Amino acid sequence: MSDGFDRAPGAGRGRSRGLGRGGGGPEGGGFPNGAGPAERARHQPPQPKAPGFLQPPPLRQPRTTPPPGAQCEVPASPQRPSRPGALPEQTRPLRAPPSSQDKIPQQNSESAMAKPQVVVAPVLMSKLSVNAPEFYPSGYSSSYTESYEDGCEDYPTLSEYVQDFLNHLTEQPGSFETEIEQFAETLNGCVTTDDALQELVELIYQQATSIPNFSYMGARLCNYLSHHLTISPQSGNFRQLLLQRCRTEYEVKDQAAKGDEVTRKRFHAFVLFLGELYLNLEIKGTNGQVTRADILQVGLRELLNALFSNPMDDNLICAVKLLKLTGSVLEDAWKEKGKMDMEEIIQRIENVVLDANCSRDVKQMLLKLVELRSSNWGRVHATSTYREATPENDPNYFMNEPTFYTSDGVPFTAADPDYQEKYQELLEREDFFPDYEENGTDLSGAGDPYLDDIDDEMDPEIEEAYEKFCLESERKRKQ
């Protein structure tokens, strides 16, 4: 009976189960032979207590390893009075240890050692291939340089290739210099008939007149192609076909200036494009000189007459834009020929301001244009010919030169003939060593003037005076 009291409750119940809750199961941490807590305490050496908490005993591994992926069930221990808050004991599945490929360390000499089992991972067959086509995400568009490397061969028609290039220049005008040469070479290989050349001219003209910001870029493109396209059919080369297309629009100028709003808007775009062509289209003479197209000069004069003859606000605004763009060049060209066309245009502007029923803002624009022309179109010319200053022709030649001092304190300048060599030497030293004063004293001390920094902090007196100045300025500002 005393043995029953000496033995802890439940100590013998786990003897035959191996994995009981009160015995040597992983949760209990007891001996394999079913010894109770009292007997276990006598056999184990005293363990030092961890500060603040009790360290639980280590969990031992199961005696046998279940098959990979299998679960084993542990029967519940006999019913015992449940503790308050304790969960009811049920059959609990136990998972295999995570490192089932390793050998299980021996915990009990009496238990048989199970053979280690190796889990073979299933082999996944990949569908990837080195010969698969290149992957592009949805919405990806190839860059311009890639799409134009092979020329127009990747496009169904020549018009699609040219239109794509024009749209690209509209969005990225800075790429003109780097890509125009390749574009011209491609056109030389694709444009081989009269119809293809006529289609090219029409595409460029429509782009330049339908998109306002493309008129300047379109004029530059026309100038480049007029010099680099080699095709010259019986109907005319690129420049001749371009001028013929502009003449077609020019011949209906009077009707367009009187037309509806849509017609006038299209006519104004043509006028500004013709002005850009006059400035950018270069014609090389027989002796290599570069001139402008005189036929465009005559056309611009007649277009101005058509605009001022129909003094509506949008017509007058278009005339102002054209004169701001080409006024100085037109006036110089007319003066060389002894013509007074610009004087006549200015007189017509003054008459419009006095008599026409245009808006106040448009009249103000016309007056600003007259003022701009009176200031020579904003150009500034030197009043006298530049001459290099010398001691002979400039009395103030030595005024801004620095003054140096000898070791005796005698000042000398570049005008002193006795010290010219010494003066030049000091000037050269000052250029290479800016930390030197006029008398050759090194401001930065004995160190390297290139490496040593000059202490630029203010003196206490200067700092105090500066603070007073700031306070005084703040006081005056608040008054």
From Swiss-Prot:
Gene3D superfamilies: 1.25.40.180
Location of region: Disordered: 1-114, 435-455
Regions annotated as coiled coil: none
Region (PABPC1-interacting motif-1 (PAM1)): 440-479
Region of interest (PAIP1 middle domain (PAIP1M)), ranges: 157-375
Keyword Acetylation: yes
Residue ranges, annotated region (PABPC1-interacting motif-2 (PAM2)): 116-143
GO BP, sorted A to Z: CRD-mediated mRNA stabilization; mRNA stabilization; negative regulation of nuclear-transcribed mRNA catabolic process, deadenylation-dependent decay; positive regulation by host of viral process; positive regulation of cytoplasmic translation; regulation of translational initiation; translational initiation
Pfam families named among the record's database cross-references: MIF4G, PAM2
Cross-referenced InterPro entries: ARM-type_fold, MIF4G-like_typ-3, mRNA_TranslReg/HistoneTransl, PAM2_motif
Molecular-function GO terms, alphabetical: RNA binding; translation activator activity
Compositional bias segments (type: Gly residues): 11-33
Matches recorded under SUPFAM superfamilies: ARM repeat
Residue ranges, compositional bias (Pro residues): 45-69
Compositionally biased residues, Polar residues: 98-111
Record-level GO cellular component terms: cytoplasm; cytosol; mCRD-mediated mRNA stability complex
MIF4G domain: residues covered: 159-376
Annotated positions of the Omega-N-methylarginine modification: R21
Main location per the UniProt record: cytoplasm
Subcellular location as annotated: Cytoplasm
Key words, A-Z: Acetylation, Cytoplasm, Host-virus interaction, Methylation, Translation regulation
Domain notes: Only the PABPC1-interacting motif-1 (PAM1) stimulates translation initiation.
Oligomer status and interactors: Interacts with the RRM1-RRM2 and C-terminus regions of PABPC1 in a 1:1 stoichiometry. Interacts with EIF4A. (Microbial infection) Interacts (via PAIP1M) with human SARS coronaviruses SARS-COV and SARS-COV-2 NSP3 protein (via SARS-unique domain); the interaction increases binding affinity with PABPC1.
Task of the protein: Acts as a coactivator in the regulation of translation initiation of poly(A)-containing mRNAs. Its stimulatory activity on translation is mediated via its action on PABPC1. Competes with PAIP2 for binding to PABPC1. Its association with EIF4A and PABPC1 may potentiate contacts between mRNA termini. May also be involved in translationally coupled mRNA turnover. Implicated with other RNA-binding proteins in the cytoplasmic deadenylation/translational and decay interplay of the FOS mRNA mediated by the major coding-region determinant of instability (mCRD) domain.
Record-given protein name: Polyadenylate-binding protein-interacting protein 1
Gene: PAIP1
